[in-house]
Amino acid sequence: MLVDYQNVNIYQGEELILRDVCWTVEEGQFVYVIGKVGSGKSSLLKTLYCELDMYSDEANKAEVLDKNLLAIKRKDIPALRRQMGIIFQDFQLLHDRNVYRNLYFVLKSTGWKNSGDIDNRINEVLQQVGMEDKKDKRPHELSGGEQQRIAIARALLNKPKMIVADEPTGNLDPETADNIVSLLHHITETGTAVIMSTHNLPMVDKYPGTVYKCDKGELQLTRTNKNA
């Protein structure tokens, strides 16, 4: 079990956003989190990588990648985040360097030392997302879809057990968005779970997954797909 939440209350500041959340995610699962703007999708995802705190008196259990989030120490959060890949709607690439150096920076800052291993891993992830011919380009020279593919490559660098994608297609045209979700769906075949928030319901129908909906302060399981 990669995620195991039992009766968790989730707050944004002092405001209760989601109450009594029960949620599990398993290896290789594709999970959608849907709901209106402001319904709690992003808040839920932020708890996974400790961007939002959770409280022991407001939950029975909150575990991610075998770490107890109700008792995790600040110094242990970076190690937890290294076991997951995080993808944002606005890409968050470093614009002062090319694609290769963007990925190089991540590997060096997460403890990789051997230059040959670094080079091999960068080439592997760029090939995985179909961007191996773009490694010398700077972000501003790429389309939105290409930048998001690079962001996915970055998320894959440390061979994460799960990927957390917060509205990864929100700034993309429909065809490009389709290609990005197809790529994320394909990634689950390697055993990596993908948790993706979206309000693109046609995409949810096209690429099957387990669907949770944030609605009226609750997280509701609305569709189960055993192969997702």
Where are the language model's segments positioned?
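Conserved ABC ATPase signature
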Residues: 138-142, 146-148
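Catalytic Walker B motif of ABC-type/P-loop ATPase nucleotide-binding domains
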Residues: 163-166
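Conserved signature/switch motifs of ABC ATPase nucleotide-binding domains
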Residues: 137-140, 158, 190
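Helix N-cap at the start of a conserved alpha-helix in ABC-type nucleotide-binding domains
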Residues: 174-176
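ABC ATPase NBD coupling module
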Residues: 69-85, 189
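Short coil-to-helix segment of the ABC ATPase nucleotide-binding domain corresponding to the Q-loop/switch region
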Residues: 97-105
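Helix-to-loop junction immediately C-terminal to a conserved catalytic motif
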Residues: 49
